[in-house]
């Protein structure tokens, strides 16, 4: 494939592939800087503490009826029109980053703060105005979910997190989607 390209050029092309892929995959949000501002993120529901996943907030396979936690988000920068929440299981490599357990989005109006309501897991019908599925969970087989997959380790002590991102989500053709600020919150273990 690169037979007519010098070894140095080939090495540059190959080393740039992950960067190029990052700009066009995973939602396609271009970071506005190398060091993004931090959002303030906390739980809006006292049942969520960041220690243990609350009772019943796991997947149906293990008897739960999990929903995303409601979150309070502050320090949302000007220019943001949506918040994207990427859910991950840090203990299970294939679903440990980039929204392995799904990406849920919320349209917002302006800078400042927002409360993101809880939405149900394991369904494409979120039932909350202004929310949307940015990407379904990457789980497969009996673990497959059309949206958010709640913690589903069967209680093995896996660690779950949410990466919360303030973005400008392009609304017109030719616009660029931008990542403006972000923050991780530990959901807990299950």
Predicted region positions:
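C-terminal motif of bacterial Sec signal peptides marking the signal peptidase cleavage site
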Residues: 20-22
């Amino acid at each position: 494939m690169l037979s007519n390209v010098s070894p140095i050029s080939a090495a540059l092309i190959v080393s740039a592939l992950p960067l190029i892929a990052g700009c066009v995959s995973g939602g396609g949000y271009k970071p506005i800087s190398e060091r993004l501002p931090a959002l303030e993120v906390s739980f809006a529901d006292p049942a969520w503490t960041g220690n243990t996943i609350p009772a019943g907030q796991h997947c149906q396979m293990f008897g739960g009826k999990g929903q995303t936690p409601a979150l309070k988000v502050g320090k949302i920068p000007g220019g943001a029109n949506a918040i994207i929440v990427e859910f991950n299981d840090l203990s299970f490599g294939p679903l440990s980053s980039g929204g392995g357990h799904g990406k849920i989005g919320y349209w917002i109006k302006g800078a400042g703060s927002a409360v993101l309501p809880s939405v149900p897991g394991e369904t494409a019908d979120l039932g909350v105005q202004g929310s949307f599925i940015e990407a379904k969970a990457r789980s497969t087989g009996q673990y497959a979910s059309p949206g958010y997959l709640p913690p589903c380790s069967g209680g093995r002590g896996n660690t779950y997190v949410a990466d919360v991102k303030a973005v400008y989500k392009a609304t017109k053709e030719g616009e660029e989607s931008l990542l403006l600020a972000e923050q991780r919150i530990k959901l807990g273990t299950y």
